[in-house]
């Protein structure tokens, strides 16, 4: 979603009485003895209030989520104070639903894991404040979670994936390529120099007024573009992928957005319609934008694979590429990445679409991973703060660019 403002402020702090009443609402019968680790994960980094209970074997014992998509579609993007208020209104209910569904008493939890970075400050604050109150009442360890690390490691919940592996994280707020060498060991190969791909898709969908399209009125921008693109001609407009001559693994999407805006303005004049009306060529525009984005993602990822293999950071055969984040739920982009992995003797793995978007399961699982590895488990919660901006791992993107790797052309027959 498009972020309309960057409001900062003091985060919501639930009263101790409310948390105490919340805990008293659980009346579990004794008898079940949990012999393994169980983590409650809480996610409020953007516009989804989510919670889940996961055990160390990867079983999802309970989950709940409240999506704000419908509200933000009406405002044309996420308004942080509005998102904060919706998190406040729903977080207690969502956590309670996840715990109730799991059948796990709060006292039987091994730890509580919560997203504290990166994300919208006001949204992060709600989740952190609620979690710290809960941790204080239950006297449980607290595990701070990096949102993008959680996306990267989700695949280890659904598939047996060993380190190292390459991950492409693509969402509404992020776009990066990283080598995952361990639970908390990441090498950043490239990132977006401007906006994220999901943000760009939302802006294009908004400019095309797809919320007025009868088939797309309840869809997020990215989903609307993917849906409409199936009906369009991806070659109707000639748009070159961004950073075509830059031999690194960085991404850029503002140029693609601006070119698309010009095409839309031109077509509006040709069709004699005003801004805000649906173009007859909307499906062709959606298909072209989606295809161009896919080609851009593939080329940068191709270079990352070649770089990692040249430096023996990945095995020469059967290396794993993981695509995660909300945009990775786009099946056209997945098929494009499959063409790449087939050409480079790699294996493409993607979490199920529902685990690509923000969710509590990935946060709880990241907590399990850290609990097993003994990393970042806090018993003293004094001074913990959320971090709206936070890099991922060690940045070696300059080294990647200096390698100046030429990428062979691939036939994108999708």
Curated annotation (Swiss-Prot):
It comes from the Eukaryota. SUPFAM superfamilies: Actin-like ATPase domain. Residues 1-29 form a transit peptide. Disulfide bonds: none annotated. A divalent metal cation binds at residues 147, 151, 358. GO terms for cellular component: mitochondrion. It holds the Pfam family TsaD. Its cofactor is a divalent metal cation. It catalyses: L-threonylcarbamoyladenylate + adenosine(37) in tRNA = N(6)-L-threonylcarbamoyladenosine(37) in tRNA + AMP + H(+). Required for the formation of a threonylcarbamoyl group on adenosine at position 37 (t(6)A37) in mitochondrial tRNAs that read codons beginning with adenine. Probably involved in the transfer of the threonylcarbamoyl moiety of threonylcarbamoyl-AMP (TC-AMP) to the N6 group of A37. Involved in mitochondrial genome maintenance. Monomer. This is tRNA N6-adenosine threonylcarbamoyltransferase, mitochondrial. It comes from Homo sapiens (Human). The gene is OSGEPL1.
